Amino acid sequence: MLKLVILCFALFYNTVSSTRFLFGVEVKCDFDEVFQLTVSHWEDDGNTFWDRDEDITGRMTMFARKKIFFYQDGHHGFEFGKLEPYGWFLHNCTKNGNFREYRHGLSSTSGSNGLEYIEYTMSEFLKIVRANKKSDRKLDKTYLWESYLHQFEKGKTSFIPVEAFNRNLTVNFNECVKEGVIFETVVHDYDKNCDSIQVRWFARIEKVCGYRVLAQFIGADTKFWLNILSDDMFGLANAAMSDPNMDKIVYAPPLAINEEYQNDMVNYVNNCIDGEIVGQTSLSPKFDEGKALLSKHRFKVGQRLELLNYSNSTEIRVARIQEICGRRMNVSITKKDFPESLPDADDDRQVFSSGSQYWIDEGSFFIFPVGFAAVNGYQLNAKKEYIEHTNKIAQAIKNGENPRYDSDDVTFDQLAKDPIDPMIWRKVKVGQKFELIDPLAQQFNNLHVASILKFCKTEGYLIVGMDGPDALEDSFPIHINNTFMFPVGYAEKYNLELVPPDEFKGTFRWDEYLEKESAETLPLDLFKPMPSQERLDKFKVGLRLEAADMCENQFICPATVKSVHGRLINVNFDGWDEEFDELYDVDSHDILPIGWCEAHSYVLQPPKKYNY
């Protein structure tokens, strides 16, 4: 391996003259008014930069009050050995609001009027690499966490850790991806000169932020942000297992190695291997095995299942899986399964059309196995053949026999829930009261007074509804182990709004209402157990995440924890007003660590508006 390292490094060291660096730039304005800042590179005014890089061009305009944080590229030239950011500023951070031009110089910010320029050398943000995947133009519009990750390096923001969330991948990597772990990664310094050979080196994880890690190359100062599910990240010794003869993979350090080793590669390699790799915790082969399993899904495109009608919750319809993305599935009602003319897709998001998007997690309360409606006597809107098919399934289950499914049916076993303790289940009674986040609402920022209306035959399922004259009309089936039901008194205890029953007059008090209705509360041990305090403490105000909008579930957005209410977090979608905030249980599959979308090639919606 030593010869390969020296040969490869010697071959390419002389062909690449500089390495790109990122500068985090903080611009402060003395005046308490919204100001405008336009940043242009040297190329804009015809000045000659000593090593022109056509990829580093363009300009951007930003608006903010008091302060803007952004980043720009610079070069580290081996010949000159210095860092150099570059750019023109046009700004109106002045007493009279008139625009001033300011050319940035490393030594001084004089002449900037009320503007102050502060620079920080930042780590490189590496885009996720997906081998053998076609490019998707939709992903050109996806939002990236680059700016916030650079702010994290300055201690100005943070993220909810992966281990705080409910399971959101089909494979769990929490135990192997940790700070201090050493792994193999691709060195892209050689890409232009090494078409048929992949060059790798070793790096150590310094910080973990969601599915992004801040890593540093062994034996170099270079740091970079990498998605752990990128095809650029490997367990240690992966190269030897993937390419035993090392015909297609070689090891070589990044070009920006520590200066004292640039002319002594033998000592450099020995120091890296003996001093920083041998005996250290490394990313195991199980990591690579786990990544390979991510492409294997429990379900398949074309399978049919039963889907609750979100606009008429007393009805179930037949739907097909159109796309699969990790645990999330795009499902829709198709002409193939519907007994009448399909509703207009503009009025019904669950109906298939060329652009239909109805994305839900595989554990969503909206979906049921084939035969659920027949087993439980629930209203089913389907073709005659399907109804007859599911009636046979229901009869087989009733007789204790194995049902005969079609090959494309999603079965009860595929959507199985955890068993319920029979002793606890006996405590459940029709009429018992609880508090509910309405999963069919257009707003998810309060709780409602609700009741158990009836039992389903399928174990653990109930028909529930919000108290009031429309309780039956708006009722729906749900498994007792869910993220929407909470015990009586939860809203008051955790400072949330409790919506009283429709047509209720006066001030609502639970004790008075229960006495008036001659009702009792659903016992505490029927609800999901409260997570440990250690886990709840990982959800702090100001931490960032990705969240699926429960009103329009095809959209996953960058978001921030605004407040914490026991096991519920109030989430604000970045750039949106607080009226659009939504409450999520910490076990919800609709909240995700940062980096989930890019890891699954799913579009992360940009914030509605930028202020940096």
UniProtKB/Swiss-Prot annotation:
Chief site of localization: nucleus
Impact when changing residue 253 to S: In allele lin-61(n3624); does not affect binding to histone H3 trimethylated at 'Lys-9'; multivulva phenotype in combination with lin56(n2728)
MBT repeat positions: 143-249, 263-380, 381-501, 508-607
GO terms for MF: chromatin binding; histone binding
UniProt cross-references to SUPFAM superfamilies, sorted A to Z: Tudor/PWWP/MBT
CC terms in the record's Gene Ontology section: chromatin; nucleus
Keywords per UniProt: Chromosome, Nucleus, Repeat
CDD domains: MBT (cd20088), MBT_dSfmbt-like_rpt1 (cd20097), MBT_dSfmbt-like_rpt4 (cd20100)
GO biological process: negative regulation of DNA-templated transcription; vulval development
Domain of life of the organism encoding this protein: Eukaryota
Cell location: Nucleus; Chromosome
InterPro entries: Mbt, PcG_chromatin_remod_factors
Keyword Hydrolase: no
Keyword Repeat: yes
Reported phenotype of the disruption mutant: Multivulva phenotype in combination with loss of function of class A synMuv genes lin-8, lin-38, lin-56 and lin15A and with the class B synMuv gene hpl-2. Reduction of brood size and defects in the development of germ cells. Loss of function results in suppression of mat-3(ku233) mutant vulval phenotype.
Entry function: Synthetic multivulva class B (synMuvB) protein required to repress the induction of vulval development by Ras signaling. Unlike other synMuv proteins it does not associate with the multiprotein DRM complex and the NuRD-like complex. Interaction with methylated histone H3 is essential for vulva development. It has a role in maintaining genome stability.
Free-text note regarding domains: The MBT repeats specifically recognize and bind histone H3 di- and tri-methylated at 'Lys-9' (H3K9me2/3).
Assembly: Interacts preferentially with histone H3 that is dimethylated or trimethylated at 'Lys-9'.
PANTHER family: LD05287P, POLYCOMB GROUP PROTEIN
Record protein name field: Protein lin-61
Organism per entry: Caenorhabditis elegans
Native organism taxonomy: Eukaryota, Metazoa, Ecdysozoa, Nematoda, Chromadorea
